[in-house]
Amino acid sequence: MPRLTVGTKNMLYPLQKTLAVGSCKPEQVPIRSLASVVESSSKILDKSGSDREVDINVSEKIYKWTKAGIEQGKEHFKVGGNKVYFPKARIILLRPNAKHTPYQAKFIVPKSFNKLDLRDYLYHIYGLRAMNITTQLLHGKFNRMNLQTTRFREPQIKKMTIEMEEPFIWPEEPRPDENSFWDSTTPDNMEKYREERLNCLGSDANKPGTAFDGVVGPYERVAQPFIPRFLKREIDNKRERHAAELQRADKLIALNRYIEDLH
């Protein structure tokens, strides 16, 4: 098939535009010139500029509304119409990460919660003003109970970070020597021991444990005396024959007692 030159492609382009019209009247669509492109882009710029002005006006309106509500000691947002007297939502306050400032707080919220719900909840229950809220939805992690079962996904976790008016600094954690209940060494070792015992299958059955510094086992196998293979087989056969003879003798004794009881 011969290759199309630039002039041939320009000649075929209006024909392709005509076929693309469909079942309507075949009407040739002219190719746009460079001037029309520049003109349309200038219109888009003008339109985006007007939209930006509208956004600025809305943001200024929200800012003034929020400022007036804070100065008057009222809500800095529009309160919802549905009244909830006994909220069942569980809100968990988390410790801040290294990227968080003292003016930020992070919560775990239900997946049905949105930003407006958290803002309303914190203000009416704790009197805390949430100025800006960001949402983060963590994917469910894969987990399994043990190696025999199939893996499954844990539920997703939804977190929200708010910005506050005043800073809040978490108190320092007490040292284990100050508060024995704050020492998590024993629970962590118990969890590690449980995981090791559940996963000790096959070649890992005799693997030494690491929980509690290996005191509770499983222990490493000690050196065993060398026994030749043929001698080990001979000893095992004698042991099995002796066990079979004892089992046969027990059955004969039981049968003899049963016959004596009948007479």
UniProtKB/Swiss-Prot annotation:
InterPro entries named among the record's database cross-references: Nucleotide-bd_a/b_plait_sf, Ribosomal_uL23-like, Ribosomal_uL23/eL15/eS24_sf
Localization per record: Mitochondrion
Main location: mitochondrion
Keyword Transit peptide: yes
GO biological process, any: mitochondrial translation
Transit peptide, start-end: 1-45
Complex formation: Component of the mitochondrial large ribosomal subunit (mt-LSU). Mature yeast 74S mitochondrial ribosomes consist of a small (37S) and a large (54S) subunit. The 37S small subunit contains a 15S ribosomal RNA (15S mt-rRNA) and 34 different proteins. The 54S large subunit contains a 21S rRNA (21S mt-rRNA) and 46 different proteins. uL23m forms the wall of the exit tunnel. Interacts with the C-terminus of OXA1.
Function comment: Component of the mitochondrial ribosome (mitoribosome), a dedicated translation machinery responsible for the synthesis of mitochondrial genome-encoded proteins, including at least some of the essential transmembrane subunits of the mitochondrial respiratory chain. The mitoribosomes are attached to the mitochondrial inner membrane and translation products are cotranslationally integrated into the membrane.
Protein's UniProt name: Large ribosomal subunit protein uL23m
